[in-house]
Amino acid sequence: MGLRGCGDMKLWTFLVSLTIEDYVKPRYGQPVNIRMVLRDDTLLKAYPEFERLTLYAMYSPKRGTAGYYNPATNGMVVSIGNPSDDFQYQIEGVLLHEIQHLIQEIERFAKGGDPKTLGRSRYHRLAGEVEARNICARHFLSQEDRRRTLRTETQDVPDLKQIIL
């Protein structure tokens, strides 16, 4: 399950959003070391491939808070609307979502996709996208709630309606 046998997704977490914001905002458009936003190196131990990941942050008023991972360049882009926008938990959620896509790539799990090529409805139903959104939803639950709640109770598309590419 997930982290090469580690099981509990809570093993890898990010620094609090304000700390990430203080580090990332002055570096928009520049490569950011993923270590600088992780609480500890548990993720890097489980997935040494992340050491080579290039993380970029950018402003994009049209896109708002969004992100994407490009396996061809091993780059991850995290976008937030405007320099004055408050990060709160937005960047943390985008990082979780996009990191899950990289884990899917490494583990050869069901992958996500691009709504521009698949259409919004099919994209929303892709098993990799459902999993990545569910990782975010579960991350913000307490550890006790996460243990009590099945993944099927927090995912936004039932298993039988998901598309696996």
Name each model feature, range by range.
Residues 102-107, 139-143:
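A generic secondary-structure signal for well-formed alpha-helical elements
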Residues 30, 34, 86, 122, ...:
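Charge-dense, low-complexity intrinsically disordered segments
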Residues 1-66, 72-73:
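A metal-dependent hydrolase signature that marks the N-terminal structural subdomain at the beginning
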Residues 120-165:
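Active-site or metal-binding loop neighborhoods of secreted/extracellular toxin and effector enzymes
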Residues 49-92, 99-106:
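Active-site scaffold of zinc-dependent metalloenzymes
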Residues 28, 109, 143-147:
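Surface-exposed helix-capping loop/turn segments at secondary-structure junctions
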Residues 89, 105-129:
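Post-HEXXH active-site segment of zinc metalloproteases
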Residues 95-99, 127-129:
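Alpha-helical architecture
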